From Swiss-Prot:
GO terms for biological process: NAD metabolic process; NADP biosynthetic process. It holds the Pfam family NAD_kinase_C. It is an enzyme of class 2 (transferase). The lineage of its organism: Bacteria, Bacillati, Bacillota, Tissierellia, Tissierellales. Its EC number is 2.7.1.23. This is NAD kinase.
Amino acid sequence: MNNNSKIINIYVNDNQKSLETALIVKDKLEQKGFKPTFDFDENALINLCIGGDGAFLRAVHKYEFSTIPFVGINTGHLGFYQEILIPNIDKFISDLINENYGIEKISLLESKTAIRNSSKTYTHKALNEFVVKSDDSSIVYLDVYIDDNHLESFAGDGIIVSTPSGSTAYNFSAGGSVLYHGLDGFQVTPLAPINSKAYRSLLNSLVVPSKSNVTLYFRDHNFDRKSSIVLADGLNRSYDNVDYVNFTYSDQYINKLVFLKDWYWLNIKDKFL
């Protein structure tokens, strides 16, 4: 973190409330001697995201998983990543000036998508989760391997592979477990699994260590359709004739500013209970 920098990168959602908040924050920062910019500057002190969790995720991807610490002002609904509330903007700026914060390292997942009968592979990263499914809402058939061990022949709507940070997002809505954000592992969660004599699919999520290697092989049933979809934090990637998708922990990570020591438990209670 470049503590000598006065530059603040601002990423803002395009709704009216977020845009108005961004202008207010920009003015307040300038009054305190900061240099806010709506462009990305690699020498910035922080990346400030204004919006909801979607804005935070889009900023992380747009800034290519920069190690400049991210922090969010919440103008959305859930705001799990967005720690700063609009009434607390002045306190946020004061804490920033006085360095009253911690920095948390957040792990990323990496996927490699291989195309059948081709040497082509596509690599992506995700902060929250990857989702593998068909492009037309039909059943997807997958052989699931953990560290080269065959676990199951899955049939269903798809599979979510999520980080601890992402466990409170789509994974949670799909019936997956909430993993403490500091846990060293990730989660594999089925979407509408079929469990019958013909198909034996796990009905619940599976938590694996961070060193694990998870691979989803597309079975021959899938190749009568054209495309399959691999979603990275909601960003749609469509591929023809996928052979397999492999998931591992990434060597990259992002940093997040933390102003409240117990922010995680406060978030869990505030957002879900």
